[in-house]
A protein has these predicted regions:
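Asp-based phosphoryl-transfer active-site loop
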Residues: 4-20, 94, 244
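Conserved acidic, metal-coordinating active-site core of Asp-based
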Residues: 112-232
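Surface-exposed amphipathic alpha-helices with a cationic face
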Residues: 28-36, 99, 176, 218-222, ...
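Active-site phosphate-binding/coordination module
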Residues: 22-131
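Mg2+-dependent phosphoryl-transfer enzymes with acidic/Ser/Thr/Gly-rich catalytic loops
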Residues: 2-7, 23-24, 204-285
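Short active-site oxyanion
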Residues: 38-42, 61-62, 157-159, 229-230, ...
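Short, structured coil segments at secondary-structure junctions
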Residues: 59-60, 68, 178-179, 246-247, ...
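Residue-level signal for inorganic ion chemistry
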Residues: 34, 45, 68, 159, ...
């Protein structure tokens, strides 16, 4: 007997969309199945709302958790339910340290990716914007990001520090002296290689402290009056770990990071490109 699911929450990249930015037709059918059963569907991503708006519309999702939990939006009304931003002090600290250690940094506001040059994830987002015709997302190239922050004081949900070196774990420890920030390390090498720009790298995603997809899903759970025991959460990456672990049914796709598989209720037999998301939906709904 299938468990009664009243909310489906899923990561996007690496879970519904594969690493080459393709979507299995099976996954589209699974999304239609959720909608036909009148079950709310929440997309949960590390990207900002402006980056993700097009795909949210394509999926006809009900709710969006963006920036790894820094922003929650009712996608049917456009109402922002919750937001957290980095303080100017913390943002300047991160940007200054990144430049001191010669790391690439870009930052996310409501509508814009701000960077000194397009490289790594911001280059990926730029290519996908051009490919998919995303009008909601803007890019601003600045001469010096620290100077820009000091002058314009942008409201920033998250900062991303990237390198092709293998030194970010040590840098993360340095940033962790600031207990007002949350730093998530993600490895995009080998089997996790970024296929859109065909490059290996690693990055830190930096948000206000105690903010992640799981905390945002907890907020949404209370907002919708749906107990966590009746939520199906699906993911592949380390920023999905807690929401997969703490939901009634937590699913890791076949090509997920091993840490996610260890806490999941179920690991799909199929890979993302073959419809892993659809397998999870058909098994539990």
């Amino acid at each position: 007997m299938k468990k009664k699911i009243k909310l489906v929450a899923s990561d996007i990249d690496g879970t519904i969309i594969d690493r080459s930015n393709n979507i299995s037709p099976k996954n589209f059918e699974a999304i239609k199945k959720i909608q036909n059963k009148k079950i709310p569907f929440a997309v949960c991503t590390g990207k900002s709302y402006s980056v993700s708006k097009g795909i949210c519309e394509q999926f006809n999702a009900n709710y969006g958790i963006f920036g790894n939990g820094t922003q929650i939006v009712d996608l049917k009304t456009g109402k922002e339910l919750h937001r957290d931003i980095l303080t100017q002090e913390d943002l300047l600290f991160v940007a200054t340290m990144a430049k001191r250690f010669h790391y690439h940094i870009h930052i996310y506001t409501d509508t814009t990716i701000i960077t000194e040059r397009l490289k790594y994830m911001d280059l990926r987002n730029f290519k996908l914007k051009k490919k998919n015709g995303v009008k909601s997302l803007k890019f601003r190239i600045v001469l010096n990001i620290v100077d820009y922050i000091e002058k314009h004081k942008p409201e920033v949900f998250s900062a991303v520090i990237t390198t092709e070196d293998t030194t970010l774990q040590e840098f993360k420890n340095l940033l962790n002296i600031n207990d007002r920030m949350e730093c998530t390390y993600i490895n995009k090498r080998g089997q996790y290689r970024d296929q859109v720009i065909n490059k290996d790298y690693e990055y830190l995603n930096i948000t206000p402290t105690n903010i992640d997809k799981d905390q945002a899903l907890e907020f949404l759970s209370k907002y919708l009056k749906v107990p966590r025991s009746q939520i199906l959460a699906i993911g592949d990456n380390v920023n999905d770990l807690n929401m997969v672990k703490n939901s009634g049914v937590g699913v890791a796709v076949n090509d997920a990071y091993d840490d996610i598989k260890k806490v999941a209720t179920y690991v799909t037999e199929t890979k993302v490109s073959d419809g892993a998301f659809a397998e999870a939906i058909n098994k539990y709904i």
